[in-house]
Each structure stands twice: as structure tokens, then as C-alpha cells.
Amino acid sequence: MPGKHSDSATSELCEKCKENISILVVRAKPICHDCFARYVHTKAIKRLESFRVNFAASPDQQRKILLPLSHGVSSTTLLHILDLHLNTQRSKTNRTGFAISVLVVDEGSLDPARLDKVRERYANHDYASLPLHDVFRLLPDDASLRAFLPESQVQEVCSTQEQLTSLIASLTSATARADVLTTLRTRLIVEHAKQTGCESILWGDSTTRLAEKTLAETAKGRGFSLPWQISDGKSPFDINFHYPLRDVLKKELFSYVDLAEPALSALVYEPQSGATQASMSSKNTTIDDLMKQYFESVEENFPSIVSNVVRTTGKLEVPTGATSNPRCSLCGMPVPDGRFGIHGWGGDQHGGADDAAAVSGGSLCYGCTRSIPQRGTAVASK
Amino acid sequence: MPPSPCALCHTNRALILRPKDHSKLCKACFITVFETEIHHTITTNALFTRGERIAIGASGGKDSTVLASVLKTLNERYDYGLDLVLLSIDEGIKGYRDDSLETVKRNAEQYGMDLTILGYDELYGWTMDQVVEQVGKKGNCTYCGVFRRQALDRGAARLGVKHVVTGHNADDVAETVLMNLLRGDLPRLSRTTSIITSTPSASSDPASNTNIKRSKPLKYAYEKEIVLYAHHKSLDYFSTECIYSPEAFRGSARALIKNLERVRPSAILDVVRSGEDMAKLVPGSDEGCGGTCSSNIPVAEEEEGGCGSANGRTVGGDMANMEKQLAQNDTAADQNLEVEITSKKINGAGMPLATGKKGKKGFTPRKSTKQVMGQCKICGYLSSQDVCKACVLLGGLNKARPKNKIEIGYEVQDLQQRDQGADGVANALQRTSIGGD
């Protein structure tokens, strides 16, 4: 996975500084250790110019941002870079441009010792850990989420953990389960950021991850939401989204993890790489897995194409007045013209019988309707 | 496990697992559902009007054969009132196109439709066999694709037909959406996802090469279902691939589409839906509603389902070439960053990052300009340049030719146009009758 290391027998000079011996080939250029670190730092910090030190503000008016940490390569690297950046700001100007709040979402397999190690190494930030099922507790309009629970669960009063378990169990495919889990995780992170007073969320998505997301959401029928999901700036949730690592490839981050001093490997936990290759049967493979495999192979030989996909999608514009469109109850995206459900467009081949179900089917966007099973009878009875 | 009954009629035994939604159907119900869905696509998008004359782009392959069969069936069943004709383009490839055209001739007899065959040599003075002799096998697909795009419109104009239907299916459209994302081609997204496109006209001349509608009635039909339909109706179609593109293999987008379909059957339609939604998000695009209302989107650069539609339209070197070009763009952008880094190094020696000394913001690419459609100076066909691409390629071919045995008759005047049209039809009829012997 790391970038190609140059052969020590035929070492050549770093192409940037012309002084040190190169240890890595980045985008077809040999580069040394220091220049590579500077390369990654520059790419990330360049994206955060709006978070520079605000000398006009008083020290107690500190801006707060949230960093969701999954213990993967990308979010761990982002935390490392931001920590370094804040230390530099503090040592030069005796204050920082923002404060970091780190959130770890527990989906059942979280090892608390991992978070302790991170906290120990980057001690100057707030840390929180929340279970995923807290999304049912935090969302103010949780009634709309509860509507997707299976029939038997609606009547009873049960814990948020049981609600989450039964919701996921009612989904019929691995892609649907992965899709809903991702959506709920995003909602949880957003709600936590709002309630803790953060003005922005810094996601650790690399170029490769954003390209994967572009094609995965396209394949799930959420093309309309791509401007919200890929671009820096406003999100549909009244909070800003930023992707500081959007110009760095995933393989470059893997190299960075190995080369940082001390190495970040002890903090990183990437469980999926083995599991992804093992489960090649179509039963367990998800659309996200497929796109991940695809772009990891494209990235090896054609890294500029990966960048180009992200750049292209970044050009898509949110239509004027889009924020006033009705929202999907699950993912929260504004649906153009309120076209909910999978009916009522050119590709829908069924006649009027389903129109009644579509009207009473609630307010899910096309992509979420593909994941959540239809409950026409139950929904119509409400 | 006992055989399950059909999900629709609950009487017959289910023999077909439907690719689109994995429902189990018997043969009769599958055929009915397939045809009804095409009918639904035609009516909801208002593709046809009563009394309209429609040319079906027929290649002898499965898509156009199924299209012709379904349109004939629906035209009779629902009384569209259409006049259907078959229009074939003969690229002049021995051993491939002449065999597939035999299939089209048989189809014309079976369906009772008029058939017109136009050859590249008739339109351009060159057959693909001759082009390959001249330029070799590499790159000849470019000539064929450019010629074919124009040929269908010029053939329709000769017949006086204002509407051409093609056999593009959902897999083709979804593949094109993904390819355009991978290539970074946003303006093309709108064109490829629209079910109706047309060649805008600078003149109101009814006999000109413009003002011809194109539509794709099979846009929401899966390729696998088209094959199943052809099989269960015992349709006669030709399935050999083009002999001049043996190196064409499944492109990235094609393989990706097939993998997606395996993971989730609806993914192909989901990609088509996303493509339609994204087309409205492209900056500078006309505010159409999913391409349904916009019937005047220019067709000029729409990709045809070319020879060997089962193969990807991406040749192996495309991604490498694009990578090289994009890498150069990135290098140019990096020059700015490099200058910035150097200046920082001078100011703050040893500091990894200087604060508050940001120089240039970086490389800002210019917005792509919109294409303006005009007419080719030489042949009068639609073109955004002075001379259309086919004439440019033709000029290159003719320069290398020792002497011109066949002169291309350009249709400059109305009278000449009508004469050409009449001659074309007569020649086609002769060819048909010869084939009948």
C-alpha cells in the first residue's frame, strides 16, 4: 500500500531540494523525507487558511472544530498534522487559530486502549467517545428516524441499542447495511458537533476516499447530493464541512504514517484491508467495497485520474435555493423538487398502482429508498 | 426445492430470474413486462407523435434487433400510428458488416419494414477496409466513430425522416456516466443522460442535415434483459465483434458497471438516475428537468454505440494518456507551490511551515467555455468548428491518396440534394432486391 520506495542501490537526489537522498517516489518524482513531510503538511494546511490565527479576536473567543477519528490512516494523519500545526502556532504567536475536539464513534468493536494512546500523544485536545446508537438520542426529530424501525419495534419502548440492532437487522443486503450505518454515523457526528458548539467538521477524507465516495454515491442513486458530500464549505446541516486532505492520495498517507517520527503505526488500526480482499463473494461485497478496490487499483497507475474525479465533482454546483428543498428523513440531504422515493422518474417502469404508495411512502431520497425496505402497508395505515 | 411459480401470473413455472430486480417470471410474463416497460418509457417521455416517420438505426446486433421488434409490436398493439423504416450504415468491412447486413435484410423481411443501406464509400469515398490500409489498425476506430455519427443523420435526411431511434440501453448510459466522471467531462453528462437529443438547426430548410431528433427507447432496459428477450422470442441477430478492434477490451467503466450490477441489481438504473440528477448540477447547463423536457440538447458529440458494443469504448491506452496529461497539469500547478515553498525557506530557515505569509493561492483552472454550434463550411453538417471533424479526417485521408477515383458529391443545392436522395434510395432498393435473389 505505501508508495514506491526507491531502490537504495540506485539512490537519486530529491527532485525538490536537490540535496538529500530520495526515499520515496511521489507522483513520479523522487523525494526525500523532509520534503515529503512538507508536501503533505502543505497540502493539508493550505486548505485551512480560513482557520488562521485571528488576532482581532480575544483569546477566549476560540473557534472550535470537530475531528471525527476512526483510528484509520487518514483521520490519524490529519490529527497529527493539525496537532503539529497548532503547536507551531502556539510557539510563534502564543495562541491558536482554533481548538480541536476529537470524536470517536463506537460501533461495537472499539478498543478503549486505542483512544488512550491517542489522547496520551496529543494531549491538548478534547476527546469524546460515543456509541453509534446514540444517534437516536441526539437527533431532535428522532421520530422521523424511528419510522424506519421494523414493525414489531414501533410499539415497544426499547433502548437505543436495541433500536439500532433491529434496524440494521431488517435491511436485506450488505450494501444497504453499510449505507445506513454510514448515514447514521454522519448524523451522529453532525449532532455532536452542533451540541458541543463546533463551527466546522474536519473530515479526514483523502483524494482517493472522495473519489470512491463520488462513484459509490452515484451508483446508489444519490447523484443529486454530490455537491454537498464532496465540496468544502456549507453542508445541509448548518455546519461547515472541510476535507483538508482532499489533495493527498491514500497511498501517500500510508507512506506518511510509516515515515513520521515517531511512526504513527502504533495509533493506526485498519481492520478492513484483509477483510475486503477476503470477501469477494457478491453476497458480502458492498458498493463501497467495490469502489474502494477500483480506486486503489487506479491510484497505483493513474493517480491524476483520481484527482481529476474529485476536481470534476467539485465543480458541480448546488442549485440556487436548494437549502429550502424538503429533506430526506434519513440522510438529511435536500431533495430537488421533493422527488422522494424511487418512483416518478423516467426510469421508473411501474404504473399508477405504486403512486399511492409513493405518496404515503414518507420522505426518503432515491438512494435511501433503495436501502430501506418498503413498508407500504404499515406506512399507509398511519 | 420445488420449482417456484411465476411471480406475476402464479400459474406457470418460473423460468427466468429477471436481471433488473431478481423477480422470478415465466416466459410469457417476462416478454409482456419487458414490452410494457418500453411502452411506459415511450409514453411518459412522449418520444413519438402520431403519423411520425421513424428510422431505426439497425446494425444487426441484439440492441437494434430487439428495438425494431419491440417497436413493431408496440406500434401495432397500442396504435402509435408510426411509419417505421430501417436505416443501416455499411462501413465497408468485409467479413463483418456484410454478414451483419444480411441479418438486417432478413429482419426487414420479417418485420415488413423498408430498409435503406448507406455505405461509407457512398458518403465519404472511403470504406473502412481502405481506411485501415491507410492508417493501420490503431486509431481507425476514431475515423469510424466520427463517420458513423454523421452518417445516420445524413441518411435520415435523405429519407426525409426527422426522428432516428437507436438501441442504447441502460448499461450503455450508465457506463457513459461513469466514464464522464472518470474523464472529468461534465458538459457531456447532460447530453448522454437525455433520452431525446436533437441536432440544432441554423437553417429552417426541411431537407437539411439538421433538425433530426434522436431518441433511445431502450434507455432504461438492461442489457441482459435485451438478450433474454431476443432469446425467448427467437429473434435473428448478429453477434460477431468488429474485426478491426480486436484489441478493444472491456474498459474500466464497463467492468465496473458489471460488478456493480452483481452487488446490487438496481445499481445500473441508480447510476442512470444519478447521471440525470448531476446533469442539472453542471454549471452553465440549461435548467432541464432530468433531460425529459430538454429536447433540444445538441447531439453532436454524443457517443454512438459503435462497433462491438459489448466491448468498452475505452482503449487500453486512454487512461495512460489522460494520466500523462493530468500529471503535466499537476506539475504546472505545483510550480506555483514550489515557488511558494522556496520563498518560505528563505524567510523562515528551518521552520517547516511559515504562518501568515501565504503567497499565491494556487493554480485556478479557467472555467470551460460553452460550445457554440454552427455549420461546416464544406458539407453543411453541424459543427462547432469551421470544418467538421469528418471533413478534417477526410482531408487527411485524401491527401495521402495517389489519385481520387471517386469524387464526393457535397449537397450544396436543394435540387442536387433531392437528386442525391432519390439516387440513394434507388441504390438501396437495388441492393435489397439483389440480396433477395
UniProtKB/Swiss-Prot annotation, chain A:
Subcellular location: Cytoplasm
Coiled-coil stretches: none
GO molecular function, one term: nucleotidyltransferase activity
InterPro entries: CTU2, Rossmann-like_a/b/a_fold
Primary localization: cytoplasm
Cellular component annotations (GO), alphabetically ordered: cytosol
UniProt pathway annotation: tRNA modification; 5-methoxycarbonylmethyl-2-thiouridine-tRNA biosynthesis
Record keyword tRNA processing present: yes
Keywords for this protein: Cytoplasm, tRNA processing
Keyword set includes Cytoplasm: yes
One GO process term, biological-process aspect: tRNA thio-modification
One Pfam family it belongs to: CTU2
Its job: Plays a central role in 2-thiolation of mcm(5)S(2)U at tRNA wobble positions of tRNA(Lys), tRNA(Glu) and tRNA(Gln). May act by forming a heterodimer with NCS6 that ligates sulfur from thiocarboxylated URM1 onto the uridine of tRNAs at wobble position. Prior mcm(5) tRNA modification by the elongator complex is required for 2-thiolation. May also be involved in protein urmylation.
UniProt cross-references to HAMAP family, sorted A to Z: CTU2
Family recorded in the similarity comment: Belongs to the CTU2/NCS2 family.
Name of protein: Cytoplasmic tRNA 2-thiolation protein 2
Lineage: Eukaryota, Fungi, Dikarya, Ascomycota, Pezizomycotina
Gene it is expressed from: NCS2
